[in-house]
């Protein structure tokens, strides 16, 4: 026997659901009326970077935007900040209401994993490089929760920021390899005035660390402009900026191709950096072209508004 209860949905208002079945039923009903469902997965503590994803989703004609807020325990390691991750739920809802978001999904861990870790997604080799080096199970947790959200919401499009570029690439791999019927949209990184990539974890930085954190974007810019001299010149220029920053502990500076495979000369690539200031770990990346006059592959890299017409149709 099926459950005939249909959850309430008020068009033009912010509707908050905590039960996966409710979101699935509402999404299905909306699709049957011709609405196009867009998903923006988040862990809350929203900032302008998240809002750029929402705005990109809302630009799709006929869209209804679903924002999920779920701090996923599967993607945190034993010594990481699961218990202290920023929680600003009321403020998050106010921001989303101001953006005219119609659906927010706020499940509990028990609702998302009612049977524990009985079934999970196991990614390929890329998940154990870069961010996966010190965090070997991180992307298992990321891909598992993303796949579950896609199954629950059944969106036409799902939106992720390019700041977590490795995550974006791995999600695209999963969607392709598992034949998931969704378009994955990457939205350019949104930055503070001094270039620091927006992140919910930036609130952990004290004032001195906050000033020093701008070195990551400065390093990427230096690398991009040095790329006319080749891949090694780009890496050396980025590393020089980071090494000159007191208190900054660099985990890696790497140049990869757009799919995060090995980089080759005279091609587009991604310059990625991870570093720590105190207990706070920071990530950033930029698209560059080796041998290009400016070295910067995308002139819209740092812009909040970014047109991606193929997925907007």
Swiss-Prot record:
Pathway annotation from the record: Cofactor biosynthesis; (R)-pantothenate biosynthesis; (R)-pantothenate from (R)-pantoate and beta-alanine: step 1/1
Residues of the active site: 50 (proton donor)
Pfam families registered for this protein in UniProt: Pantoate_ligase
Gene Ontology molecular-function annotations: ATP binding; pantoate-beta-alanine ligase activity
Gene Ontology BP term (one): pantothenate biosynthetic process
Annotated signal sequence range: none
UniProt enzyme class: ligase
Major localisation: cytoplasm
Record's function text: Catalyzes the condensation of pantoate with beta-alanine in an ATP-dependent reaction via a pantoyl-adenylate intermediate.
Subunit: Homodimer.
HAMAP family named in the record: PanC
PANTHER family in alphabetical order: CYTIDYLATE KINASE/PANTOATE-BETA-ALANINE LIGASE, PANTOATE--BETA-ALANINE LIGASE
Full protein name: Pantothenate synthetase
Top-level taxonomy: Bacteria, Bacillati, Actinomycetota, Actinomycetes, Mycobacteriales
């Amino acid at each position: 026997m099926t459950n005939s209860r249909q959850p309430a949905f008020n068009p033009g208002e912010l509707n908050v659901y905590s039960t996966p079945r409710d979101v699935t039923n509402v999404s299905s009903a909306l699709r049957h009326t011709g609405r196009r469902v867009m998903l923006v997965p988040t862990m809350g503590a929203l900032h302008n970077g998240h809002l750029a994803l929402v705005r990109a989703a809302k630009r799709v004609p006929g869209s209804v935007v679903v924002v999920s807020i779920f701090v996923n325990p599967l993607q945190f390691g034993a010594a990481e900040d699961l218990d202290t991750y920023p929680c600003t739920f009321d403020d998050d809802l106010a921001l989303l209401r101001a953006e005219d978001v119609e659906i927010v999904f706020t499940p509990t861990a028990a609702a998302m994993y009612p049977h524990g870790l009985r079934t999970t997604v196991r990614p390929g080799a890329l998940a154990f490089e870069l961010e996966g080096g010190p965090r070997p199970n991180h992307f298992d947790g990321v891909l598992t929760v993303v796949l579950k959200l896609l199954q629950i919401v059944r969106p036409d499009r799902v939106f992720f920021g390019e700041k977590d570029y490795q995550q974006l690439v791995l999600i695209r791999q999963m969607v392709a390899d598992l034949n998931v019927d969704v378009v994955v949209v990457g939205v350019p990184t949104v930055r503070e005035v001094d270039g620091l990539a927006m992140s919910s974890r930036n609130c952990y930085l004290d004032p001195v660390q906050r000033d020093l954190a701008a070195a990551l974007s400065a390093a990427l810019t230096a690398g991009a402009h040095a790329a006319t001299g080749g891949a090694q010149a780009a890496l050396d220029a980025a590393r020089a900026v980071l090494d000159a920053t007191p208190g900054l502990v660099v985990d890696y500076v790497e140049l990869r191709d757009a799919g995060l495979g090995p980089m080759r000369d005279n091609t587009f690539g991604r310059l990625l950096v991870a570093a720590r200031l105190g207990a706070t770990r920071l990530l950033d990346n930029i698209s560059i072209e080796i041998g290009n006059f400016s070295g910067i592959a995308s002139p819209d890299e740092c812009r909040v508004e970014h047109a991606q017409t193929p997925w907007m149709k």
